[in-house]
Amino acid sequence: MNPIVKQFKYGQHTVTLETGAIARQATAAVMASMDDTTVFVTVVAKKEVKEGQDFFPLTVDYQERTYAAGRIPGGFFKREGRPSEGETLIARLIDRPVRPLFPEGFFNEIQVIATVVSVNPQISPDLVAMIGASAALSLSGVPFNGPIGAARVGFINDQFVLNPTTSEQKISRLDLVVAGTDKAVLMVESEADILSEEQMLSAVVFGHQQQQVVIENIKEFVKEAGKPRWDWVAPEPNTALINQVKALAEARIGDAYRITEKQARYEQIDAIKADVIAQLTAQDETVSEGAIIDIITALESSIVRGRIIAGEPRIDGRTVDTVRALDICTGVLPRTHGSAIFTRGETQALAVATLGTERDAQIIDELTGEKSDRFLFHYNFPPYSVGETGRIGSPKRREIGHGRLAKRGVLAVMPTAEEFPYVVRVVSEITESNGSSSMASVCGASLALMDAGVPIKAAVAGIAMGLVKEEEKFVVLSDILGDEDHLGDMDFKVAGTREGVTALQMDIKIEGITPEIMQIALNQAKGARMHILSVMEQAIPAPRADISDFAPRIHTMKIDPKKIKDVIGKGGAVIRALTEETGTSIDIDDDGTVKIAATDNNAAKAVMARIEDIVAEVEVNAIYKGKVTRVVDFGAFVSILGGKEGLVHISQITNERVERVADYLSVGQEVTVKVVEIDRQNRIRLTMKDLNNDTPVAENVTEEAEVSSEQQAEI
């Protein structure tokens, strides 16, 4: 086995592509590496098309093996399970730029599998997987119009950084992944810390320029190791059938696309399809229903696109830059912490915000170790939202992808843990859908967070843009419908505040989208975003001053870190008793910060008082109230200051002679005691002599446990 290797510099990193030694029964296989992060990518393509196949069955799977990071999986089975959310998102990242590069009419099944086999914690495997998939598809000989390149762009100290390391990403104001061919950008996925439209576009152009080195080296790699190109020819169009369908359907489809209401329009289109199929199959039984539907779909595209290019009104009668009618309601669910319904035309999202404590944070088990996520965003797309029946269950890839995009849009305005010590979860339920439900989720989330009293930095709105391009003519569309998304050449989603962009996602189906066109789209999107923000600000101009009565209130106090073990107790006994007895939730940080969450303010204050007792220092000669915990022959043990036990010797109970301790004291009895001595082993000696229940007792709070105005914040 003599592997063929291609190595090249890519920014600050070295990329290695290797083929010919592993997985030789696959159509193509590439071991792609970037500075010790290695992803093994295979492509298997079927030479024959399944009978009746009428779509392109491309599957992309991305999987991370824990051995790549020198770890053994957790859990009972000790092996990797179903794909995580992160793996699903990276699979989509690979799929989106390669799918449009297969020719129309190519229906052969292809599976791409990317497996992470080694990981350098400083190099994210997603970019390596994209480069490996591009190389493997290019080597395979399938009719793939690539290769593509991929680049990650950061923005640090007002400078763009190519493929920043994990450490650099933490201080970057931008995380943008761009993929494309040598001629055109195909995909952008990004989140930003409120950057301008010009900065975002410059980042896209920068990434596309820098990735050309990847494309050139893959082309050279293919010359050396590529398989012969498949002798595939697109099927000849059935001109006679096309003319028959046109004669029966074209005028009727044109009329149908003047119906503005989606369901009524779809019913009319379905009726036309059924009628045309019935007529043509009656004339010739060999005619394929699938072929007729494909021709009708092409007619729909031609009619809608032609009208847009000609400057005619859109499907629902709008001009190119008009946003659909908006309707906003906040506080719609009485017992939730924050809620809103955002409606844009026939797209509607019910967004709900929930506040939780530190223990509600999501622990994510990644290759490089565990991390905690304090902001959760879940997007649900039930079948009723489009008037259909369907399966309800675990989220599909699309729901995971849309949820992550919406989360990216809102993340930049979320408060820090110091500013707002809550874990926040937002759920967006799509109740109606006709285009851009992910951007409706961004708007709904912003409204629900403000309704919940989350001090977000600014309101965020999202808008989906579209494009229709015919030769040199093009039209950019604001707030696209589902049909315009399906029949157009670009899906371009922008989320942001009045000050700038927080998320940008772009999927382009054709070549020839220039930076100038992208600039027009971004500027048009900005105008639409400002309009939506104006309407949102009328509904709720700022976050609520107070959180919901049904949300937990977090009280913060500071204790000496050395006292943390006392508050937790042996095996967690003390803290468990505190939470169970008061119905509160207690979290303690390593620096001694104690966070108490409770819906009952009195319960929180009671817990704080008990913690103050626990951490307070016992002072010699101080007098305390205590409770008898044990009675023995030689005296009684009394608990003071939240659990510190001291001994009252039989001789110290009273000035009289005591024969039996039980004659004077019983378990649970409250007594007043004075500290006589604390010995070297921290044992406390107490006395009850000359004391009674009216004797003034010491304050139970010492300097270490005092809660100052700076240390305590009642949220």
Swiss-Prot record:
Q: Give the species.
A: Actinobacillus pleuropneumoniae serotype 5b (strain L20)
What segment(s) does the record annotate as region Disordered?
A: 695-715
Alphabetic keyword roster: Cytoplasm, Magnesium, Metal-binding, Nucleotidyltransferase, RNA-binding, Transferase
In terms of Pfam families, this protein maps to: KH_1 (PF00013), PNPase (PF03726), RNase_PH (PF01138), RNase_PH_C (PF03725), S1 (PF00575)
| Domain (S1 motif): residue spans on this chain | 621-689
One GO molecular function term of this record is: magnesium ion binding
- Sorted alphabetically, which InterPro entries does this protein's record hold? ExoRNase_PH_dom1, ExoRNase_PH_dom2, ExoRNase_PH_dom2_sf, KH_dom, KH_dom_type_1, KH_dom_type_1_sf, NA-bd_OB-fold, PNPase
Q: What cofactor does this chain's UniProt record say it requires?
A: Mg(2+)
GO cellular-component terms in the record?
cytosol
Q: What is its EC number?
A: 2.7.7.8
Entry-linked Gene3D superfamilies: GHMP Kinase, N-terminal domain, K Homology domain, type 1, Nucleic acid-binding proteins
The entry sums up its family as follows: Belongs to the polyribonucleotide nucleotidyltransferase family.
Q: Where in the cell is it found?
A: Cytoplasm
Please report the name of this protein according to its UniProt entry: Polyribonucleotide nucleotidyltransferase
Q: Can you state which reaction this protein catalyses?
A: RNA(n+1) + phosphate = RNA(n) + a ribonucleoside 5'-diphosphate
Q: Which residues bind Mg(2+)?
A: D485, D491
Q: Start and end of every KH domain?
A: 552-611
Q: Tell me, which GO biological process terms does this entry list?
A: mRNA catabolic process; RNA processing
Q: What does the UniProt function comment say about this protein?
A: Involved in mRNA degradation. Catalyzes the phosphorolysis of single-stranded polyribonucleotides processively in the 3'- to 5'-direction.
The record's subunit annotation is: Component of the RNA degradosome, which is a multiprotein complex involved in RNA processing and mRNA degradation.
